[in-house]
Amino acid sequence: MNDRKDPILYIVIPCYNEQEVLPITAPLFLQKINDLAASGKISPDSRVLFVNDGSRDRTWEIINELAASDEHYVGICQSRNRGHQNAVLAGLMEARDRCDITISIDCDGQDDINAMDGMVDAYRDGCDVVYGVRS
């Protein structure tokens, strides 16, 4: 991995039946990675990791299309629906040996992705754990 001044970030996004919102929110997550990398806060090797949690719609197909369109998108697929927390855990376990920072966020766009800037800054300043609470 890198040092704290050039960390690799993985944004872990659990997805269950997200075919409607995924095409809207995925580019926002990618733009956040690109913006943070362009500002020198994270490594350009950072990724957006989608975890398909046994969706019954086109979610997994869309994740595969995204991954084929840009190397910064990656995805894993659970064989069946295991629940939100297990999907987050699966993503964290997948990412743990590939990055310095993991941030989990829901796919629906209800959380402020700009909060990631402060989280990355806190990590770069020496924090090992940073969390946000929606207000």
Task: Locate each region found by the language model.
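Structured catalytic core of nucleotide-sugar glycosyltransferases
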Residues: 1-135
